[in-house]
Amino acid sequence: MKVKAFKTESKIAAGLVFLFVVSLIPVFLVGSYGYPSADDYGFSAYSHIAWMNTHSVWQTVKGACATVVERWYGWQGTFSSIFLMALQPGIWGMYGLVPFIMIGAVSLSTLYFLHTILIRVIHARPAVFIGMSMLYLLFAVQCMVDKTQGFFWYNGAAHYILPHSAALFLCALCIRLLTEERKKAYRLFMACLLAVFVGGSNYVTALIAAVLFVTAAGLLFLVKKGNKSRLLALPFLFFLAAFLLNAFAPGNAVRQEEMVVRPGVMKSILLSFYYCVEYVVDIWFNWAYLLFVLALIPFLWEAVRALGSRFSYRAPLVVLGYSYCVLSAMFTPSLFATGDVGGGRIFNIIFLDSMLFVMLNLFYCMGWLYRKFEAFRCMTGAAKETESCFERKDVRWYLAGVLCFGIFIGAMYMKVNPDYFTTVSAVHSLVTGEAAAFGAETDERETLLQEAVESGEAEIEIPRLTVHPYLLFWSDIEEGAEDWTNKSMARYYQKEAVFGVKR
């Protein structure tokens, strides 16, 4: 099918890129005031001590490896996540890079994954790929469930956002291994590296990666291309080895001893189906999510047209059911391990994947309708479409309506909750001086700590933070010196005790 004109979709795609880039400016500016907290200190103590004593990158990496070994035996098996957590940017005084790292990881992995699907497999036009990618990223960044743990607190984001991004890269590489002949050796090597990283990361991402590996093999055999599954065998074996090393770490048993109430396997699975509906449908699907869906529809329609009759879309209900099962499975590890549905950092990656599954199901259902409509066209002798749907007057009116709806929804949410959108929250913190005040308090704290390091004091009193910006503040030390956060900070700075005192 040839398309005569697609200027409008190109302009819209360019506008979305501009909007996304501009929306990040306040986010990165407020991120410059970021400061380590809680587990940032505990997991990076060895690395920080090594850097302060030697200023050697190699010795710092060795410190991170020592942390991996200690935690693997004593607390948790997620070795690849621990390695990253042990190298938090605050070691080098660059904690302000955290939002660049996290948003960059989400953006690059999403772009690579959607480019693989839309350009390499479906053969959609670049403007369609860019438009869909920007809509996804805009909604992901602005409406993340827990923005602090997603983009600003390194320890939480490194454990979930970075493995999620690695898993997207891994999925895209596996698809390219199956569909393209070029660069197979390079892609296989990179897929194996990423498979090890994902297998050694958080259990939510690792479990879904295992499900997708099995699904891919099953689909290949179903379409009688089982011989291609050997291309995925090596990455899967690397993933499996890493996952087993992760799951059977002695530290996991130590940590489980602290979990008093834990449901069994079957109850955890059943609860997962319940919580999937509660969170994905009831809590997260709001007016902003509806706006995301409405804005996607014209781009998805063009993707469906690009694929044309090369796919039959025979089982929309099966795809819907599969999506529900996979998203439900993402709730299971936390329920089984702790008896709790999980925290914001876990919700973040479930939220990101739910958006991808919404895109998949919308695409599949629209494809099913397209094939039915195509058959009807043939029967009635109607002419084939010859231009992008964005050039049609009715679609332009539809997009104008979506834009007005978006402005209304944005204004409503900003009025009711200024922290709902990440950019608005960042602007609020910058304009009110809240971010600068937080930065002044953390700078004062850092000065006191560095002076204590230079003077060799064994104990030090640190004023507790009084300014708590929504995006920047995760937690603080407690009064006295006995809380685990105080002990982590003391270990990080090689002190016998850090006392939190009222300012």
Predicted segments, located by residue:
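Short hydrophobic alpha-helices at membrane interfaces in multi-pass membrane enzymes
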Residues: R176-F197
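Start-transfer (signal-anchor) and selected internal transmembrane alpha helices
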Residues: M1-I25
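Signature aromatic-anchored transmembrane alpha helix within multi-pass, membrane-resident enzymes
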Residues: L307, R314-L320, W368-N417
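Transmembrane-helix motifs of polytopic, lipid-linked glycan transferases
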Residues: I101-P126, I130-G131, Y136, F169
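Membrane-embedded, lumen/periplasm-facing catalytic core of multi-pass transferases
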Residues: G344, Y398-E482
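Transmembrane alpha-helical segments
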Residues: V106-I117, A166-L178, V211-G218, V293-L300, ...
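Membrane-interface micro-motifs in multi-pass membrane enzymes
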Residues: D39, R125-I175, N202, A329-F363
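Transmembrane catalytic cores of multi-pass membrane glycosyltransferases
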Residues: P26-G96, M102, Y154, G199, ...
